[in-house]
Amino acid sequence: MSLLLTIAKEYKRLCQDAKAAQMMTVGTVSNYTTFKKWTTSRKEKNPSLRMRWAMSSKFPIIANKRMLEEAQIPKEHNNVALWEDTEDVSKRDHVLASTSCINYWNFCGPCANNSEVIKEVYKSRFGRLERRKEIMWKELRFTLVDRQRRRVDTQPVEQRLRTGEIKDLQMWTLFEDEAPLASKFILDNYGLVKEMRSKFANKPLNKEVVAHMLEKQFNPESRFLPVFGAIRPERMELIHALGGETWIQEANTAGISNVDQRKNDMRAVCRKVCLAANASIMNAKSKLVEYIKSTSMRIGETERKLEELILETDDVSPEVTLCKSALGGPLGKTLSFGPMLLKKISGSGVKVKDTVYIQGVRAVQFEYWSEQEEFYGEYKSATALFSRKERSLEWITIGGGINEDRKRLLAMCMIFCRDGDYFKDAPATITMADLSTKLGREIPYQYVMMNWIQKSEDNLEALLYSRGIVETNPGKMGSSMGIDGSKRAIKSLRAVTIQSGKIDMPESKEKIHLELSDNLEAFDSSGRIVATILDLPSDKKVTFQDVSFQHPDLAVLRDEKTAITKGYEALIKRLGTGDNDIPSLIAKKDYLSLYNLPEVKLMAPLIRPNRKGVYSRVARKLVSTQVTTGHYSLHELIKVLPFTYFAPKQGMFEGRLFFSNDSFVEPGVNNNVFSWSKADSSKIYCHGIAIRVPLVVGDEHMDTSLALLEGFSVCENDPRAPMVTRQDLIDVGFGQKVRLFIGQGSVRTFKRTASQRAASSDVNKNVKKIKMSN
């Protein structure tokens, strides 16, 4: 008791001084939290929340005062307090500082060179901050929000990789010596590995940090979250700020264009291959599968097979649905109608047939459904929920979109529901020629109507007028749709309402498998047609910069730069030891087979058309002359081989061999299209992309079968020795020298030394000589 009384008296005496009283009554947050932590025995229930609370104060951290003064860190920068000259009571010579002091140290202090490294390490966080600044916030509405728990991506990435692919990339980038054998992903995307190595070379980062950065760059961080509305990653990272159970914050988030562009690119490629397969007279289904499996798309620096992208996507567009049906992939319960995407929500209709007369003469049958059904529809920027029953569109609610998209979406929903007077009497402008394709196939009447409204704006409005026009109720002004697609119309269309926000597509948990006919019609197990080739919009002139069409039938669709690189890559893969490989054909001087290789034929459409005969004469003469004299380079022969396919023709040669895209190669001269180095003959560069030349003889990781040739040893290069194939070695006599292709474009001279000599006794010597002669 006496001790407490003594402390109280001392406290009263100290409080007579104003400064001392303030120091004893006002403590720092750091002191308080430290005191609470070490004086309580209970476990902190929410350490993250306490840390955030502590860091929210003005000066939550401490800093060495001497270091701040030596580094000339100001107390204030851009009206933001960095530190104050108040000593921390828990640590001597330290003052109170704010978190902004750290930012100033990193970006403006003596270690400012680290700013770029810090930006790279926290690239995903800085990107999130930039996207946050681009958001256009709108009104806050209070309403009940129907949220669904779904698996969504919470981080937008430039290119998405699987977990196993990210691990392979980390190992090959950071631990090259300990990395496992190259997977197919590494072989196809080795350029990405080299890019990552050069990106992080000579930077003050440990490997654990770089591994974390690689994972953040390619991992979209999928989570199960209660969501509503669109599920783009740019929106999901802010879903906590966009709505709750009883409120919605309207906002336009950033990053929409890139996602939409990728979706449109894949739809365009699928549409091209579907139309190309449909143009074939027979086996359209098998042709479509061939086209899909021979096509790949480049996303960022990663090249992905179109087949993989189709099976992974949840896109329900008609072109993607047809391609997925051809591959046998599962789909949700979706269907397509022209360019409109549909998903059934409820109901099950019974199919009924009816008749409409064309020009009052020809009777054409069409089908409709007698029971009530509800659907979700999507066309470009507009979405809708609607109900159909019998031959009518009972009601429709359209969300978002511009006026033109809303008009066309409503028109397609009317045709889908067989609504309007034109399903009783056909328009007078529809003729008999509109009822069939150029190949004579009959077009169903609903697709005839789809083509009809595409011909003119008058046809579209005539169909909408058949819906019926009513006076807009003043109390519903702004929620009804006029004939021009606007919201605030005096006269509106019957039973058509508009809402401001976009309607989200309901998730389809049940998966089905579709069958694809040779007429390219996808149908389910009950025989219902889900998508047809007639659903595809008219073909547009689309250029593909990041798509590789390997199939010869699709040569007209190729991006020529990529096609040239792929063509040379295919030729380089023929540098093997097989009977039909390029070295064997050269040794046998089988020029006809050499000029008609499938890989040469594949590149034939890429040659400048008006000069192909002249180029063929020059290229064939170069090949035959060099092979005959024995002084040739396989790298140079590969360079001119694509120009040898056509029949030779006389003409003036200007010294360069041009492709149809005006790029060229020049015999004996390196350029950007084709280059190689004698110092490193293991690689050929096409448009800056390194293509590895196949190895036949090498170290323990390579095929050493040629080093095990019984009775042969490697000797000095002798250009007079005949060039033979591996199969002809049995005819070589004792003491004779022959030249043999050993890989990487190299030719070595071998000498027959004995008839019965153990192969194992020559292994070490042969491999050593080969390595020394390289």
From Swiss-Prot:
Signal peptide: none annotated. One of its GO terms (cellular component) is host cell nucleus. GO terms for biological process: 7-methylguanosine mRNA capping; cap snatching; DNA-templated transcription; symbiont-mediated suppression of host gene expression; symbiont-mediated suppression of host mRNA transcription via inhibition of RNA polymerase II activity; viral RNA genome replication. Influenza RNA polymerase is composed of three subunits: PB1, PB2 and PA. Interacts (via N-terminus) with PB1 (via C-terminus). Interacts with nucleoprotein NP (via N-terminus). Belongs to the influenza viruses PB2 family. InterPro entries: Flu_PB2_2nd, Flu_PB2_6th, Flu_PB2_C, Flu_PB2_CAP-bd, Flu_PB2_middle, Flu_PB2_N, INV_PB2, PB2_helical. The keyword Mitochondrion does not apply. It holds the Pfam family Flu_PB2_6th. Plays an essential role in transcription initiation and cap-stealing mechanism, in which cellular capped pre-mRNAs are used to generate primers for viral transcription. Recognizes and binds a wide range of cap structures of target pre-RNAs which are subsequently cleaved after 10-13 nucleotides by the viral protein PA. Plays a role in the initiation of the viral genome replication and modulates the activity of the ribonucleoprotein (RNP) complex. GO terms for molecular function: RNA binding; RNA-directed RNA polymerase activity. It is found in: Virion; Host nucleus. This is Polymerase basic protein 2. Keywords: Cap snatching, Eukaryotic host gene expression shutoff by virus, Eukaryotic host transcription shutoff by virus, Host gene expression shutoff by virus, Host nucleus, Host-virus interaction, Inhibition of host RNA polymerase II by virus, mRNA capping, mRNA processing, Viral transcription, Virion.
